[in-house]
């Protein structure tokens, strides 16, 4: 063959092939779904390119996939007359994996076969799934519009290298021949192959045909029988579509192996005409947090495929939504640039966003267990919503889930509606605290008074929480209040101070002044507080001061952080505060005050500027 060369696979391909053969063998029939799905994509791409260049059809506009097998040679062939590939495309698509983050993804794989199977499913194996059942794969392809002599041959045993060469191929499209491994004879059985295609490919709009051979007058007559419905699933009436069909269609468009959690199929007529089929996956994709992660919906215009990953129809905080939109209002020659500035796009985006939020609200109401699965997978992404989408902030807030002092569990199961329904009589605000961990939030001294009063506090420990709460200012007419910030509503919760206590506080005024003088401008203010029960002192910030957690976020992002000026609050009923107030020796007094301040700062920030000094002070006072 002309131009023949042997090339090595990209290292990630070798690793993926090894993992796939071992992890997916128990569900090996999916190779046929993957290859037919790829053929369907190739047909979609040809239709789209032919909109501007009809000659690409080469006189054959009847697109299809054909499946045949040869029992003597033990081969199974899947052929399409779609867009095809040239030599460079063959090398790019079949010799490398052009996905950022692939290496780190593969390194995360372990020895847990079930887990690896799910992870590879998220990754999307496509063409390489052929090697699950084949010990050699041969590809013959030609790009639509190219000359017959520009065909390409590709072959590999999947062990580290592949051969590529130039061939003559009269018909456009791609033909993939699987040389089956020993023991895979089930895929040479007509009934078995038919049942797999019916199971996985009924929803594909492209006809899938299987070869029929009949003996007539001593000759073998070959014909092709269509075995799928070949009608785009989203164009069918909802009442006619089974759940299994919706599930399989999801796996086709999302290249996922697991069923979705829920979906919404809608046809809208009137001012705008479109059909949408939107899915919520049951698992987050492996690269959800990758900056280059592609997301968005498949876009069809009047049932003609236009593009994948049309991100213009979903806000970023809903980037996990998969599915498609088929619009009658956009032009067939629409581009990403036109979509960006289109009024139609903006209207569709608004309608689809509301549709997804309604779908999630229904899921939360109808199936709390499934909604918890969703929250564990995508809750962090949804928390971006209040900052990004002010118009739908209340709807997003209803979907948020938190840990709280009411459940005494780190599981984020409490909704804001739950919280409001449990608010005490006269309680005006929704109280929360942000911290580095659930344990730090749960054990914060800021909670002592509220616990004593039986008032619920939301415990927020995700890194995004502090940022989110800057935008989520109220819910159901109730303002949010951080318990780590100074606030009159919290002080009002303290018991009425009796006359004796007032006298005792008055007697401590010189002590407070003494502490102020000692600490100077290191703190914003020193004062007594009744919000503590077991802790001698805390630090708080003013309402307009940057919070500790926000300062940490800035620092983690490498940004300069303004110094946070804390209010130093002392518990007049605590024995350590009383002992410090009674200390006459100035050096000893300084040690006690510094220790109390360091304790308060450590509880608030989790770190100290000079931990060794704190330990020295602690040890010295323990033995004094």
From Swiss-Prot:
Region described as C: spans on this chain: 553-624
A matching Pfam family: HATPase_c_3
GO MF annotation: an example: ATP-dependent protein folding chaperone
Start and end residues of each stretch annotated as A: 1-336
HAMAP family recorded: HSP90
Subunit structure: Homodimer.
Similarity-based family: Belongs to the heat shock protein 90 family.
Official protein name in the record: Chaperone protein HtpG
The organism's taxonomic lineage, starting at the top: Bacteria, Pseudomonadati, Pseudomonadota, Gammaproteobacteria, Enterobacterales
């Amino acid at each position: 063959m002309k131009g023949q060369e042997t090339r090595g696979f990209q290292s990630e391909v070798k690793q993926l092939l090894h993992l796939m053969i071992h992890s997916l063998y128990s569900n090996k029939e999916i190779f046929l779904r993957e290859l037919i799905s790829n053929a369907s994509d190739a047909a979609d791409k040809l239709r789209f390119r032919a909109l501007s260049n009809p000659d690409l059809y080469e006189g054959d506009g009847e697109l299809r996939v054909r499946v045949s097998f040869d029992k003597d040679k033990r081969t199974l062939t899947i052929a399409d007359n779609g867009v095809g590939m040239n030599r460079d495309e063959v090398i790019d698509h079949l010799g490398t994996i052009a996905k950022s983050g692939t290496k780190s993804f593969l390194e995360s794989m372990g020895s847990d076969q079930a887990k690896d199977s799910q992870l590879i499913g998220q990754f999307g194996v496509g063409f390489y799934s052929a090697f699950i059942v084949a010990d050699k794969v041969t590809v013959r392809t030609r790009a639509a519009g190219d000359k017959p002599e520009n065909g390409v041959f590709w072959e590999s045993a999947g062990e580290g290298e592949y051969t590529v060469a130039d061939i003559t191929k009269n018909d456009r499209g791609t033909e993939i021949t699987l040389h089956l491994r020993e023991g895979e004879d089930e895929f040479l059985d007509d009934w078995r192959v038919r049942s797999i295609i019916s199971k996985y490919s009924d929803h594909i709009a492209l006809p899938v045909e299987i070869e029929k051979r009949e003996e007539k007058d001593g000759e073998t007559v070959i014909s092709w029988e269509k075995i799928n419905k070949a009608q785009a699933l989203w164009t069918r009436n909802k009442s006619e579509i089974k759940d299994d069909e919706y599930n399989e269609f999801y796996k086709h468009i999302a290249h996922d192996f697991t069923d979705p959690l829920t979906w919404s199929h809608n046809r809208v007529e009137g001012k705008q005409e479109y059909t949408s089929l939107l899915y919520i996956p049951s698992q987050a994709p492996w690269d959800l947090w990758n900056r280059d992660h592609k997301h968005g919906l498949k876009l069809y215009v009047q049932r003609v495929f236009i593009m994948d990953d049309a991100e213009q129809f979903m806000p970023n905080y809903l980037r996990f939504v998969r599915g498609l939109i088929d619009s009658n209002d956009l032009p067939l020659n629409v581009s990403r640039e036109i979509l960006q500035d289109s009024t139609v796009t903006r209207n569709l985006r608004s309608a689809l966003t509301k549709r997804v939020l309604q779908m999630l609200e229904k899921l939360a109401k109808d199936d709390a267990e499934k909604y918890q699965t969703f929250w564990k997978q995508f809750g962090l992404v949804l928390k971006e919503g209040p900052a990004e989408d002010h118009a739908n902030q209340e709807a997003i807030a209803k979907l948020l889930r938190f840990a709280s002092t009411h459940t005494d569990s780190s599981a984020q199961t409490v909704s804001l509606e739950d919280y409001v329904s449990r608010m005490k009589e006269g309680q005006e605000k929704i109280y929360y605290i942000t911290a580095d961990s659930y344990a730090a939030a749960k054990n914060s001294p800021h909670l002592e008074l509220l616990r004593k009063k039986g008032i619920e506090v939301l415990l927020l420990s995700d890194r995004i929480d502090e940022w989110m709460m800057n935008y989520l200012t109220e819910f159901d007419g109730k303002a949010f209040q951080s318990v780590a910030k100074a606030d009159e509503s919290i002080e009002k919760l303290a018991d009425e101070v009796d006359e004796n206590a007032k006298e005792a506080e008055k007697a401590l005024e010189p002590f407070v002044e003494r502490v102020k003088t000692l600490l100077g401008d290191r703190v914003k203010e020193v004062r007594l507080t009744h919000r503590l029960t077991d802790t001698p002192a805390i630090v708080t910030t003013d309402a307009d001061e940057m919070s500790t957690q926000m300062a940490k976020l800035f620092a983690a992002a490498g940004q300069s952080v303004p110094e946070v000026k804390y209010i130093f609050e002392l518990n007049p009923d605590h024995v350590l505060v009383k002992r410090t107030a009674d200390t006459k020796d100035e050096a000893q007094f300084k040690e006690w005050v510094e220790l109390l301040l360091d304790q308060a700062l450590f509880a608030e920030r989790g770190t100290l500027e000079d931990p060794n000094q704190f330990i020295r002070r602690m040890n010295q006072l323990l033995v004094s």
